[in-house]
Curated annotation (Swiss-Prot):
<keyword id="KW-0999">Mitochondrion inner membrane</keyword>
<comment type="function">
    <text>Accessory subunit of the mitochondrial membrane respiratory chain NADH dehydrogenase (Complex I), that is believed not to be involved in catalysis. Complex I functions in the transfer of electrons from NADH to the respiratory chain. The immediate electron acceptor for the enzyme is believed to be ubiquinone.</text>
</comment>
<dbReference type="GO" id="GO:0005654">
    <property type="term" value="C:nucleoplasm"/>
</dbReference>
<keyword id="KW-0496">Mitochondrion</keyword>
<dbReference type="GO" id="GO:0009060">
    <property type="term" value="P:aerobic respiration"/>
</dbReference>
<keyword id="KW-0472">Membrane</keyword>
<dbReference type="GO" id="GO:0006120">
    <property type="term" value="P:mitochondrial electron transport, NADH to ubiquinone"/>
</dbReference>
<keyword id="KW-0813">Transport</keyword>
<feature type="modified residue" description="N-acetylserine">
    <location>
        <position position="2"/>
    </location>
</feature>
<keyword id="KW-1133">Transmembrane helix</keyword>
<keyword id="KW-0679">Respiratory chain</keyword>
<comment type="similarity">
    <text>Belongs to the complex I NDUFB6 subunit family.</text>
</comment>
<dbReference type="GO" id="GO:0005739">
    <property type="term" value="C:mitochondrion"/>
</dbReference>
<dbReference type="InterPro" id="IPR019174">
    <property type="entry name" value="NADH_DH_b-subcmplx_su6"/>
</dbReference>
<keyword id="KW-0812">Transmembrane</keyword>
<keyword id="KW-0007">Acetylation</keyword>
<keyword id="KW-0249">Electron transport</keyword>
Length: 128
């Protein structure tokens, strides 16, 4: 006996039809995909509305804003961190960038100005 039985033929026909319907269902209509509206941050919404008409001067303002934002976030703030670290964190090696200022006592002379520190006032009515 060669060929398919009537039950096998029916089963194959139904599978082919099911495959055809499945493939047809995979085709998107012109209205698909339906995406939800994109949520924008307030600043992003401002720039989107600002640049909508495409004026040249508005594009220049936006480019200046972007470059200044880059300069602040990638140059200025890291430089502040480096400056803070160098200024306020003493290294373990001697003769580093930062050194503690010497103590000043009454009668000492300040080298830069030549000023003499006056003696401390005495408060006889108070007990220290």
């Amino acid at each position: 006996m060669s060929g398919y039985t009537p039950d096998e033929k029916l089963r194959l026909q139904q599978l082919r039809e099911l495959r055809r319907r499945w493939l047809k269902d995979q085709e998107l209509s012109p209205r698909e995909p339906v995406l939800p509206p994109r949520r924008m941050w307030p600043l992003e919404r401002f720039w989107d509305n600002f640049l909508r008409d495409g004026a040249v001067w508005k594009n220049m303002v936006f480019k200046a804003y972007r470059s200044s934002l880059f300069a602040v976030s990638h140059v200025l703030i890291p430089m502040w961190f480096v400056h803070y670290y160098v200024k306020y964190h003493m290294a373990t090696k001697p003769y580093t960038i930062v050194s503690s200022k010497p103590r000043i006592f009454p009668g000492d002379t300040i080298l830069e100005t030549g000023e003499v520190i006056p003696p401390m006032r005495d408060f006889p009515d108070q007990h220290h």
